[in-house]
Amino acid sequence: MKFFRGMIGFCIAGMIVMSVWTPLAENYGIFGGYLAAFIIIGPMWFMNHHVGLIENDEDAAFVDMAVGIGICGIMRDVFMRGGGELVSSLPTIGLVAIGAVLAGIVAAAIEKDMARKHEAKQEKTEPGMNIKEEERLNENQLV
């Protein structure tokens, strides 16, 4: 049931974004884009994440509405203009995947660094010594 709730949430968000955002942006310019972001994404986020149509487990990768909106946009063009649209979007999808992998690597490095700094704060040091001095002493086995 969780899968179907997520699919419904993704589909609703994707269809509304694809049908409303472009006319607002075309008719009202930049203001229309901001207006669309406010009147579409806000309520869709509330429905999907706050109400709980899309559930994200603590131990799983976070899946946001952007995935559903992106898939909806790609498939809309495939249905309207044919399979060539999917083929022409593959380089963009590939670059997005590479960006996601790089972002994951950077996020993991940041988390690792934050954990290391947190552990360093937890360690007790000798009065008047900082952690680096104590590490140097431990490496030289002077303690």
From Swiss-Prot:
Compartment(s) of residence: Membrane
Pfam family, one: DUF6905
Transmembrane helix is among the record's keywords: yes
UniProt entry keywords in alphabetical sequence: Glycerol metabolism, Membrane, Transmembrane, Transmembrane helix, Transport
Membrane-spanning segments: 6-26, 27-47, 60-80, 90-110
Induction: Repressed by GolR.
GO BP of this protein: glycerol metabolic process
Keyword Transmembrane tagged: yes
Topology versus the membrane: Multi-pass membrane protein
Annotated InterPro entries: DUF6905
GO cellular component: membrane
Residue ranges of the region described as Disordered: 118-143
The protein's role, per its UniProt record: Could be involved in the glycerol uptake either via facilitated diffusion or active transport.
Protein name, entry field: Putative glycerol transporter Lin0368
Protein species of origin: Listeria innocua serovar 6a (strain ATCC BAA-680 / CLIP 11262)
High-level lineage: Bacteria, Bacillati, Bacillota, Bacilli, Bacillales
